[in-house]
Amino acid sequence: MKTTSFISTVVALLGAYSVGVSANLPDTINVHVKNLAPEDTIYDRTRQLFYQSNLWKGMIEVWDNKRQSHFNVKIDGVSSGGDGEQQMSGLSLLTHDNSKRLFAVAKNSHSFDFSPNQKNDGPSSFHCFKLPLSEQSKPEWSVYLQGVQDEFQRQTGRRPFGVVQSAQDRDGNSYIAFALGMPAVAKISPDGKNVEAWAHEDGNGGQRPGYSGITFDPH
């Protein structure tokens, strides 16, 4: 009985606090930007910049918090006004400090459309940028991922799709995680010329399994 009374009191206090805080917030916040949807953020400690992926528009926003300024980096064939075939998902840096490269993963815009319109074979891609970035920056190299998806399907009978994130090892190889179809990771060489169906696991029945992220432990 004492426990029940204590929990009820805590819930009541939390409810009162919640109401008090929310009373000062506006009921509606209007953001007049078409399809603005942040997906991933990474911080460049050396340059003190944030890199933000814009999901729907397929762009990378570079934000300088000190100067309160920003610019967008566009990728040909990926960036759009919000209705393109690809969407920007994960970002990663080659190294924790003094990174010379930024990597960007772009998934097909119909990958996570859980309806009859969902696609597992639409265009998706992976891009390597030299740092520092400018508004005119273009990828040093780009890889389209249909080929490695085909290879996974040939090996396993299942097709991974919905690329979401990448990580880089000490040698500069990239590892790209697929979130849907099957749990799978593709490996890409530092120059982008070799793409390998590197690792996979069996799917979990009729569910849509996969990896939602990946990171590299240097230790």
Go through the PLM ranges and name each one.
Residues D27-N30, S69-S79, S137-V148, V195-D202:
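Beta-propeller fold detector
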Residues V21-L36:
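A short helix->beta-strand "capping" segment at the edge of beta-propeller domains
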Residues V33-R47, V78-N108, V143-S174, D202-H219:
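Beta-rich, blade/repeat-based domains predominating
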Residues Q118-L133:
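Beta-propeller blade signature
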Residues F50-D76:
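Beta-propeller domains
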Residues M1-A23:
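Fungal secretory targeting signals
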Residues D64-Q68, K130-E135, I188-K193:
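Short loop/turn segments that connect beta-strands within beta-propeller blades
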Residues L55, A106-S109, A179-G181, H219:
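Short loop/turn segments immediately following the C-termini of beta-strands
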